[in-house]
A protein has these predicted regions:
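Conserved beta-strand-loop-beta-strand element in the redox core of flavoprotein oxidoreductases
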Residues: 114-134, 409-431
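Amphipathic alpha-helical scaffolding segments comprising HEAT/armadillo-like alpha-solenoid repeats
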Residues: 695-707, 722-736, 753-774, 796-825, ...
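N-terminal Rossmann-fold NAD(P) dinucleotide-binding loop
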Residues: 20, 314
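Core register positions within helices of long alpha-helical scaffolds
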Residues: 96, 718-722, 747-750, 790-793, ...
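Conserved hydrophobic register position within alpha-solenoid helical repeats
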Residues: 714-720, 744-747, 784-787, 837-844
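Conserved N-terminal/central alpha/beta ligand/cofactor-binding core
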Residues: 3, 26, 32-33, 38-114, ...
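Flavin (FAD/FMN)-binding glycine-rich loop and adjacent Rossmann-like elements that form
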Residues: 46, 131-139, 144-299, 340, ...
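Beta1/beta-strand and adjacent pyrophosphate-binding region of the FAD-binding site
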Residues: 3-17, 298-311
């Protein structure tokens, strides 16, 4: 395969369905190179995200799927009567594909745009999170649910089912059909299958139904009373329709074939059918293929504002602008709004400031949970998505779910101005026009397609923050739905090959596998539809927020504030910036809560007109991106973007010309912004009365001197780096005091004045006691590691012998005590390998 811009294979499958995977495995075992292009985040979504398990069949299809059946049984995914646990289908399939990683490439989050016949076969253009790519192959197979390139699958769909999981509050056997009501469209039936405890609920819709109307109908039905009267509480709802189709696979004579992905009710049969399909590829054909390229985009209409991406920021932006009177068109690739807070599996808020429209959404979600919905942790996943969609519906925003951004429309008279977007759904390609667009796709899909200049990951190696795989479960004992996440390394979500490799590896292993859910207490709900990506490319804005800029930013320029720590989810500190290392590594201030101002200019891309960013794709450097991504702040960011769009539309001007004063006044009136908020660094103290309330920047000289002699000197050390309230001469004199010696040495080093502290720092490096400060509540580092960081900051060559002793001895830190204690300050140090790693990378840095 070639990775210089064009990927080359023997076969390209547009669709990563179970049928496509079965065919790909058969072809790979014959030595062929195969590419699976899939718009979802993981393979087999037509069954896994549709909550569609079925039973192991007893026919030829099952025999062709023996490897898949073996994986499922090995994972405990098959019951004694042959029923398949749909939540383990994706892990099983991922393991099979990984075994053939040298011959099968899986490209997730990749949307085919066109297919062109060439002399040697086919050339397919596709987009992955806003970046266009090209792949070539001798043979092309359409294998996605709606046949995006061929366009003929929709006519074969006979029925759609939206499947959910409900808690049954009675012990009686629950099965059969529930009574309908006026909230459901004509012909929609509600059936229940189960034996008490938790049951499967199926809502049947006709073939024309879309996810937006279907989920709204389910919400109305559940809250209407009939559902709760049956003793049921809805706990989870599928993210894709389970589809009933009579489509047959077809082979054409020009190197194209159509593989029907959902001919069967179970994934095992579909996989086996794919194997059979591969065996028949060189058989009889029936002429030339139908249309195998994207047709002209159909018009989706003209609006005042387009919101691309209905995540934490986008959903609030759309609601805000629509309530202010704008005609809003919103598109979302998933099945519901809310992003990481719904489809991403993150139930609870992490720090941040309160205030804004999102509080209304949280209140509505809590109210939904009182009638017909199961209890959820935090502000909920299912109920929060339902609440946001209800708000979008009531304010008149036009919403399309299952829509992926594919391109942008440029103003014919101004090529730097965009006036619309192109997107793909199961019904084809569409174009919507508006003078203003909010890019709230998180990964800057619109900004990339529009040609915005981008900011990337950390400066040392370009890597982004770690991503997570989040799995959900239902606690049967307390009737509460919850989730857990597992960090799985770094990923480049714009490189489809890297994204595919990391996704499969993450799916194949993690907290959602093994014996964790084997007992009767928990019911596995599966991994969430969105990969837990924390960072991506960000626009280069008119203003860019950095740690230095935040410290000097006038308070009256801020439109909202983030409140969070610099949480990289990693321990490879030497690869981070010097500013980050000073805070986290040298001062052990991992959980220092920084109040970060965000200005209007951070939301406005430089050089591209008609575009506003909202979410974690706003203009910040990597350090600020570690913090400025939490849900409360991102929802505030969305509300600010919605107000900017309204003011720009009202005044007929570009977003960057909107009055800062009027914008701030509006946001203050909406409780998005509190005039009392300012840049600050709030640190941990042992006293609950002052914990995270004292600001490092406001410490006096006497307070700094006193704290340097305590067991929590970190805040005082950092204070010495940002002000001169305590002079260097005083710090040098304090080196003679054993109680403050370590803190004084670090304080001098953080100023770059290490000469007097050289011997103390080298002694700290050689100290193998493992002693650490209490400067943070959750994650502190040994004084030795902090001293290594200080030596690196100052270029202290005298420390090299001590550092080389650590680097050259792989077991140097094997017997260091005190770090294996179960304490709050060490709980992110997982085991002995972590300790060795911290010392090794500290010495390298």
């Amino acid at each position: 395969m070639s990775f210089n811009g064009t990927y080359v294979y023997d076969f390209i499958f547009c669709g990563g369905s179970f049928a496509a995977a079965g065919a790909a495995v058969r072809l790979a075992d014959e030595g062929k190179r195969v590419l699976l292009l899939e718009s979802a985040r993981a393979p087999g979504s037509e069954y896994t995200l549709a909550y569609r398990g079925g039973k192991i069949p007893c026919d030829a299809a099952a025999s062709r799927a023996a490897e898949l059946c073996g994986e499922l049984r090995g994972l405990g995914a098959v019951t004694s009567d042959g029923r398949i646990d749909h939540t383990l289908l994706s892990p099983a399939l991922s393991r099979i594909l990984m075994r053939r990683g040298d011959r099968i490439s899986f490209f997730p989050s990749s949307v085919p745009l066109s297919a062109e016949k060439t002399l040697d076969g086919w050339r397919v253009c596709f987009v992955t999170n806003g970046v266009r790519h090209t792949a070539e192959a001798g043979r092309l197979v359409g294998a996605d649910l709606y046949d995006a390139l061929g366009g003929g699958a929709s006519g074969h769909i006979k029925k759609k089912y939206l499947i959910g999981l409900a808690l049954c509050e009675s012990e009686k056997v629950v099965a059969g059909e529930l009574p309908g009501d006026a909230s459901l469209p004509g012909g929609c039936r509600v059936t229940v299958d189960g034996d008490g405890g938790d049951v499967t609920v199926t809502f049947s819709f006709d073939a024309a139904a879309n996810m937006c109307t279907a989920r709204r109908a389910v919400r109305s039905y559940v809250t209407g009373g009939s559902f709760a009267a049956s003793g049921l509480r809805l706990a989870a709802l599928a993210d894709e329709f389970a589809v009933e189709s009579d489509e047959e696979s077809v082979f054409y004579g020009d190197g194209y074939a159509r593989l029907a992905p959902v001919r069967f009710a179970d994934a095992v049969s579909a996989y086996g059918d794919g194997v059979l399909f591969a065996e028949r590829l060189d058989g009889e054909t029936c002429g030339r293929a139908p249309r195998i390229r994207a047709s002209e985009c159909k018009s989706a209409g003209e609006y005042d504002l387009i919101v691309a991406g209905l995540g934490a920021a986008g959903s609030i932006a759309a609601i805000t602008a629509a309530r202010l009177g704008l005609r809003v068109f919103a598109i979302e690739r998933g099945s519901q709004p809310g992003g990481v807070g719904t489809s991403g599996g993150i139930y609870t808020y992490y720090l941040g400031y309160g205030g804004g429209i999102y509080c209304e959404a949280d209140g509505l979600a809590a109210k939904l949970g009182e009638n017909g919905f199961a209890r959820e942790r935090g502000c909920g996943l299912l109920t929060k998505g339902m609440a946001l969609d209800a708000m979008l519906d009531s304010c008149g925003a036009d919403v399309v779910y299952g829509a992926s951004v594919c391109g942008v429309l440029h103003d014919t008279d101004d090529t730097e101005r965009i006036d619309g977007v192109i997107f793909r759904t199961g019904a084809g390609f569409f174009a919507a026009r508006a003078p203003l667009t909010i890019d709230s796709t998180a990964d800057s899909a619109v900004g990339l397609l529009a040609g915005c200049t981008m900011l990337g990951g950390r400066e040392s190696d370009g890597e982004f923050q770690l991503f997570s795989n989040v799995s959900c479960f239902l606690n049967r004992e307390n009737g509460c739905a919850a989730s857990e996440n597992c960090d799985d390394g770094t990923v480049d979500q714009y490189d489809p090959a890297d994204l595919g490799i990391k996704t499969l590896a993450s799916e194949a292993a993690g907290p959602h596998l093994g014996k964790r859910y084997a007992d009767a207490r928990y019911r596995r709900l599966g991994t969430v539809p969105y990969l837990g990506v924390r960072e991506g490319l960000r626009i280069k804005g008119i203003d860019t927020m950095t740690l230095e800029r935040a410290a000097s930013c006038p308070t009256d320029k801020a439109i909202f504030f983030e409140l969070a720590n610099l949480d990289s989810h990693a321990k490879d500190f030497p690869f981070e910036s010097r500013g980050y290392r000073d805070v986290v590594e040298l001062c052990s201030l991992w959980d220092c809560r920084i109040s970060i101002p965000v200005t209007k200019g951070c939301l406005i891309p430089a050089g591209v007109h008609g575009l506003i960013a909202a979410g974690r794709n706003i203009s910040t450097d990597h350090d600020i991106a570690l913090a400025c991504r939490m849900m409360r702040a991102m929802q505030k960011c969305g509300e600010a973007a919605g107000v900017i769009a309204y003011l720009a539309h009202r005044d007929g001007t570009d977003p960057h010309n909107v009055s800062d004063a009027e914008l701030r006044d509006e946001l203050i009136g909406r409780n998005v912004l509190d005039p009392a908020q300012h840049y600050a660094m709030y640190f941990y103290t042992a006293d609950p009365a002052t914990r995270y309330k004292k600001d490092i920047l406001e410490l006096t000289a006497d307070e700094i001197a006193a704290m340097l002699a305590l067991d929590a000197p970190g805040a005082a050390v950092y204070a010495c780096s940002v002000n001169r309230k305590l002079g260097s001469d005083a710090l040098v004199r304090m080196l003679d005091d054993p109680a403050s010696r370590r803190g004084d040495a670090l304080a001098l080093a953080v100023r770059g004045e290490n000469a007097a502290a050289r011997d103390v720092l080298i002694g700290m490096i050689r100290d193998k006691s493992g002693e650490m400060p209490c400067s943070s509540h959750t994650f502190c580092l040994p004084y030795a590691v902090s001293a290594m960081s200080a030596a690196g900051k100052c270029g202290m060559t005298e420390a090299l012998p001590a550092l080389l002793d650590i680097v050259c001895d792989p077991d140097y830190a094997a017997d260091i005590p005190n770090l294996d204690k179960v304490e709050d300050k060490t709980k992110l140090i997982c085991d002995g390998d972590d300790v060795k790693y911290l010392y090794f990378v500290g010495a390298l840095g």
